[in-house]
Amino acid sequence: MILVSYKNISSNELKKLIKNNENILLIDVRSEEEFEEVNIETSINIPLQDLLYNIDELQDHNDKDIVIYCRSGHRSITACNLLAMEGFNKFYNLERGIIDYLK
């Protein structure tokens, strides 16, 4: 049994972190096409299906809080579970995704 080790973060909480220049890494797990249409400033795009192939890149940012997001929050939950299985423990899921963030 895998214990979920991520926390949910609201859009308002994320906006405060960004405004305060907190040491965070934003990862958008949507497709490249979705990312090009709209994204959260300073985020990087690692599509969900490529996430495990980029684990080493994420290890280089282990000093940062990682915030994972997608369109509505479903793919990001899957991504968070993958990160938990890989041993990450300092990351967050953006509740309701970029849809809620852009409201």
Regions from the PLM with identified roles:
Residues 1-25, 32-65, 71-103:
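Rhodanese-like catalytic fold shared by cysteine-dependent sulfurtransferases
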